[in-house]
């Protein structure tokens, strides 16, 4: 049974919270927008079991990349697993509103991350973009569940909206991935 506790941290543009359990605290990664309306990655540390007690103020951990990069329009943390922070890299396009890449950053020390880049790119299985990966481990294999954009459909206002499939990829190291399966019934 879930109990709603209300707001523990106030940021008008905070979204997509990701919890990492630590020894004596919970680290909550989240996304907020900068003055250019780009997503940036942050975290706060809160007391384990009492998230209203914020132990450390918000700290920035990911910023958008340089022009032309796969995350030039923003970054959104989606999963923290071991020493890796998985995130969505955003770009803006002319033919469709945006394009995303499942990406990874490796933790170096003291919550400093080095962006490694995209881990799932367009290919024969995922002809569109990938995003929002959630990673776990089964035996010695990393399992990454993610969304795959397979189409853009005009809505009632003729704005293009993405259509998604849920897919699974596997990896031996959490960095190099192989797409293997779709959960939504379509085959791409």
Describe each region flagged by the PLM:
Residues 1-73, 79-128, 136-188:
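Beta-rich carbohydrate-recognition and catalytic domains
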């Amino acid at each position: 049974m879930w109990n709603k506790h209300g707001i523990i941290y106030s940021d008008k543009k905070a979204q997509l919270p990701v919890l990492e359990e630590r020894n004596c605290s919970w680290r909550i990664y989240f996304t907020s927008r900068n003055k250019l309306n780009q997503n940036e990655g942050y975290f706060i540390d809160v007391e384990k079991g009492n998230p209203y007690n914020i132990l450390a103020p918000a700290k920035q951990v990911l910023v958008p990349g340089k022009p032309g990069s796969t995350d030039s329009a923003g970054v959104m943390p989606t999963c923290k697993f071991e020493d890796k922070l998985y995130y969505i890299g955003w770009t803006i396009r002319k033919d469709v509103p945006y394009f995303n890449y499942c990406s990874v950053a490796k933790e170096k020390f003291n919550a400093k991350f080095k962006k490694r880049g995209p881990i799932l790119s367009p290919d024969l299985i995922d002809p569109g973009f990938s995003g929002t990966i959630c990673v776990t481990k089964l035996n010695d294999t990393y399992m990454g569940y993610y969304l795959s954009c397979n189409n853009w459909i005009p809505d009632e206002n003729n704005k293009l909206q993405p259509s998604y499939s849920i897919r699974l990829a596997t990896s031996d190291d959490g960095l190099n991935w192989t797409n293997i399966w779709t959960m939504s019934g379509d085959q791409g």
